[in-house]
């Protein structure tokens, strides 16, 4: 269980989150079949393939400027923002590192779904960065540089389960031109050791974050969450699942 500093705990009795549905558009061409998966895995069943989300990413500095403007506008309208949240796989590593510093400058918590590239597998991670919220309330000097402080407080939690796109989903999301509807299309990510990060804000709020598929699966992780009983669970959905025909 990680704790926000005592100074922050004394100050906050509410939590205002800015939810940014990024990217604003996802196209069928952002998905592709992985033609050459790693050789050290068991042979896929004949009715399954791996699929990868591979969108064209905006330049990190341009994207960070967007987030900076969004936070400034949200503060104008709401008075105070304590955190900003991005969906599953919304950012790549470069975008995340840029936005992390924007969140710190605004003194807010950052929760983001980040897509990492690996030598073989991709990785899907939710990263929580509380440093902005901590240092906004705790003004004590710190001799460490900003990058070092960000690295110290950064909490990463890798996705526990692969997403499987079946025929109904492929057709519903109009991905039939990119993924074979006749086969199960499994998310091309590595499954790391399962971890859960719980955070507390004073004695009134405890919370954790989960990537979308991990909330749906009733496995030992769900039992742990029920045992801890956090007052808030932040679930990061995959933006593509909110298709225009389903939006409400």
What are these regions (language model features)?
Residues 1-83, 90:
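N-terminal, active-site-proximal structural segment of metallo-dependent hydrolase catalytic domains
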Residues 28-31, 93-101, 120-127, 219-222, ...:
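A short acidic (Asp/Glu
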Residues 48-55, 134-195:
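Low-complexity, serine/threonine/proline-enriched polar segments
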Residues 41-44, 104-111, 227-233:
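Structural alpha-beta junctions
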Residues 76-78, 82-86, 172-248:
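Active-site beta-loop-alpha substructure in enzyme catalytic cores
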Residues 58-158:
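Cys-nucleophile CN-hydrolase/nitrilase-fold catalytic domain and related Cys-dependent amidase chemistry
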Residues 8-19, 26-28, 150-152, 194-209:
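Beta-strand-turn-beta hairpins that frame and shape the catalytic cleft
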Residues 21, 130, 157-161, 211-213, ...:
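Short, structured patches in soluble enzyme cores that scaffold and shape functional sites
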């Amino acid at each position: 269980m990680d704790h926000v500093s005592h100074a922050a705990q004394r100050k906050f009795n509410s939590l205002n989150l800015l939810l940014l549905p990024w990217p604003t558009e996802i196209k069928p061409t952002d998905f592709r079949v992985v033609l050459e998966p790693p050789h050290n895995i068991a042979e896929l069943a004949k009715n399954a393939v791996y699929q990868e989300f591979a969108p064209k990413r905006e330049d990190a500095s341009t994207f960070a400027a967007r987030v900076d403007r969004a936070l400034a506008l949200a503060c104008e309208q709401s008075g105070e923002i304590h955190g900003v949240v991005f969906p599953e796989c919304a950012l790549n590593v470069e975008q995340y590192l840029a936005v992390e510093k924007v969140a710190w400058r605004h003194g807010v918590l950052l929760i983001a779904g980040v897509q990492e590239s690996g030598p073989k597998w991709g990785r899907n991670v939710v990263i929580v960065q509380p440093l902005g919220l901590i240092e906004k309330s705790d003004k004590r000097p710190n001799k460490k540089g900003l990058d070092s402080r960000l690295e110290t407080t950064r909490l990463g939690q890798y996705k526990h389960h692969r997403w499987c796109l079946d025929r109904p989903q492929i057709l519903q999301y109009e991905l039939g031109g990119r993924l074979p509807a006749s086969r199960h299309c499994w998310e091309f990510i590595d499954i790391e050791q399962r971890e859960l990060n719980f955070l507390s804000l004073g004695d009134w709020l405890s919370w954790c974050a989960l990537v979308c598929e991990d909330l749906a699966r009733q496995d030992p992780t769900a039992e742990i969450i029920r045992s801890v009983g956090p007052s808030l669970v932040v679930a990061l959905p995959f933006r593509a699942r909110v298709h225009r025909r389903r939006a409400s």
